[in-house]
Regions:
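Active-site micro-motifs of SAM-dependent methyltransferase domains
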Residues: 50, 98, 204
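A short, flexible beta-alpha/helix-coil linker loop
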Residues: 26-29, 58-62, 203-206
Length: 218
């Protein structure tokens, strides 16, 4: 269990299940914010070979990678002398799995008792890579903008390795009907074993200009 107790703020997390509890002076108090960071988002590259139109970073093939030494320096800089380190990091890109030192980055994160999570397009997921990540990852999120893009075998690789798997479904005016179908349970069988599906509305500069409010639910 991970614990942090600071004056009238208390936090407990189970890194295995992902369960967290926060309370204030008493168990009934709900703190507005944490006095020190608990999670950090870290972009380890801006390199990606897929070129999704909705990418909020407009990532491309540029071999722009954060080196392991600098990554470790970032982790160590977040270690408070009194209250300790952040509990989790969310690794993004670019495509994290295209980073040549990705497994080393995961190892360095775990060595500091920080739980790593990451978002991926899933193209490079294999049974071998999922096996290497098993027991080391809090959760993996697969980014899609269509259920047709969601490969069942990629989901199976993660689920069979015991890795908690989420879906990041990126919304646009072109897929709102499908998003509503997801909410109605039309894809429950395909999503069996998924921890959560999260609908995201942000994206590239072009994507953000689309007017989602123009959609009318049939």
């Amino acid at each position: 269990m991970l614990e942090r107790h600071i004056a009238d703020y208390h936090f407990i997390a189970d890194p295995t299940t992902g369960m967290t509890m926060r309370w204030g002076t008493t168990i009934k108090d709900n703190p507005t914010w944490a006095p020190v960071p608990e999670l950090a988002d870290i972009s380890i590259s801006n390199h990606c070979s897929k070129g999704c139109s909705f990418c909020y970073k407009d990532s491309c093939i540029n071999n722009d990678f954060l080196n392991v030494e600098d990554y470790c320096s970032i982790l160590d800089s977040m270690n408070h002398p009194k209250y300790g380190n952040v509990f989790q990091v969310a690794l993004g890109g670019g495509e994290p799995l295209e980073h040549p030192n990705f497994l080393e980055i995961i190892a360095e994160t775990c060595r500091r008792s920080i739980v790593p999570n990451f978002t991926t397009n899933g193209m490079l997921l294999t049974p071998k890579i999922c096996g290497s990540l098993s027991g080391k990852i809090g959760a993996v999120a697969l980014s899609v903008s269509s259920m047709a893009d969601l490969e069942l075998k990629k989901l199976a690789f993660l689920i069979d390795a015991g890795i908690k798997t989420n879906i990041h479904y990126v919304l646009s005016k072109n897929n709102l009907e499908e998003a509503c179908m997801i909410l109605r349970g039309c894809y429950n069988e395909k999503l069996n074993g998924i921890n959560a599906i999260i609908f995201l509305t942000y994206g590239s500069k072009y994507h953000r200009k689309q007017n989602l409010s123009s959609y009318k639910n049939p």
